[in-house]
């Protein structure tokens, strides 16, 4: 039992892929008025794929390709196999991202932004502490209500973090006059810095386009990187690129189970590899979902009906309940183990403790 717990811990740790992408965005506490989703009747267009939907609704179709953008285009084209492997990583999330962007009337090509941010990897963690598909920094995540608990990190959750990121992008897009280059620069470098540099150039009578602003090198490179991948997707035939087959339809569904559920038990129930379950539900940071009345799992949509038919039978024998104990004065591992009728060695393994020392207010399972 304990070794299974440790096995799960090491699996989760191995899935946390370090990314070089960094996000230094920080919006002021006195956030500007946030845009509301737009209720519109979507045109009844039968797109052949997600790629076609992005291309036909892109607002960058006739963009000017400067030398920096061409440099990144050539870099992608120099290794078509690597570029294809990059695109495949968005398979389970890009349709959902596109739907959310359309809800706020944002440019469809922003669905490609996670390729720049995180390689569409929900486990991605930068050296600066940014996390998830959208590389949220802690301060920005808090403003947009993303929770971080012992059990759950919503910056890693691909769907919840996407909803927050789209709200943030809508805010930036409105704040900077729906200028896409400004929106991208603000997302990467922070809106306060961008606004300051725009005002400074205006005061000095200098051009105000993003290339003329004094911005960090990373932010300067961010826009052409994005423009390059947009160009290759929107004009894939021109560059002889075979795009992965992503249908223009939802590929993820939701299964809601009663109580707290172990991830490995659910993976066996769904007949999915644990690594895949964690990928679709990357917000779960431990071997089980958070203690709650219900647990929601993202799964391939074709499995939803089958799992819903059998979920009551599954939860009757697989529901778990963990008790959390907060360390108080006078506590020791021996006393806590005696109180909960368990062993000190079990407590240490489950809580990843290397010694018998405890900290005041430390939470133990």
Predicted regions and their residues:
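Sec-dependent N-terminal signal peptides
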Residues: 9-18
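Second-shell loop/turn segments in exported
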Residues: 73-87, 97-99, 121-131, 147-159, ...
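Secretory-pathway/luminal and periplasmic proteins that interact with or process carbohydrate-rich
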Residues: 119-127, 142-144, 172-175, 191-204, ...
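Primarily a LysM-type cell-wall glycan-binding module
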Residues: 244-274, 317-341, 354, 359-363
């Amino acid at each position: 039992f304990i070794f299974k717990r440790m096995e799960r811990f090491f699996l989760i740790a191995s899935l946390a892929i370090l990314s070089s992408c960094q996000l230094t965005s920080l919006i002021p506490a006195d956030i500007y008025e946030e845009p509301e989703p737009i209720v519109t009747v979507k045109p009844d267009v039968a797109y052949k794929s997600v790629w076609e939907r992005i291309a036909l609704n892109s607002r960058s179709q006739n963009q000017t390709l400067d030398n920096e953008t061409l440099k990144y285009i050539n870099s992608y084209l120099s290794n078509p196999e690597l570029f294809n492997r990059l695109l495949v990583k968005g398979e389970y999330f890009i349709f959902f991202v596109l739907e959310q962007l359309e809800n706020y009337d944002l440019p469809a090509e922003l669905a490609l932004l996670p390729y720049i941010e995180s390689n569409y990897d929900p486990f991605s963690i930068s050296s600066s502490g940014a996390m998830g598909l959208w590389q949220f920094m802690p301060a920005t995540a808090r403003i947009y209500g993303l929770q971080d608990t012992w059990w759950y990190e919503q910056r890693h959750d691909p769907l919840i973090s996407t909803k927050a990121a789209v709200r943030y992008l809508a805010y930036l897009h409105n704040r900077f006059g729906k200028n896409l280059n400004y929106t991208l620069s603000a997302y990467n470098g922070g809106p306060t810095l961008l606004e300051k540099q725009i005002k400074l150039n205006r005061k000095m009578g200098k051009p105000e386009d993003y290339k003329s602003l004094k911005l960090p090198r990373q932010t300067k490179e961010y826009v052409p990187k994005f423009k390059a991948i947009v160009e290759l997707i929107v004009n894939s035939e021109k560059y002889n690129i075979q795009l992965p087959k992503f249908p223009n339809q939802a590929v993820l569904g939701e299964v809601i189970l009663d109580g707290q559920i172990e991830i490995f038990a659910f993976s066996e129930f769904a007949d999915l590899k644990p690594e895949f379950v964690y990928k679709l539900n990357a917000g779960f940071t431990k071997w089980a979902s958070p203690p709650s009345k219900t647990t929601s799992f993202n799964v391939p949509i074709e499995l939803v009906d089958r799992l819903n038919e059998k979920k009551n039978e599954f939860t009757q024998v697989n529901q778990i309940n963990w008790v959390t104990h907060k360390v108080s004065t006078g506590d020791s591992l021996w006393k806590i183990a005696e109180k909960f009728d368990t062993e000190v060695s079990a407590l240490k393994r489950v809580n990843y403790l290397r010694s018998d020392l405890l900290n005041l207010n430390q939470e133990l399972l």
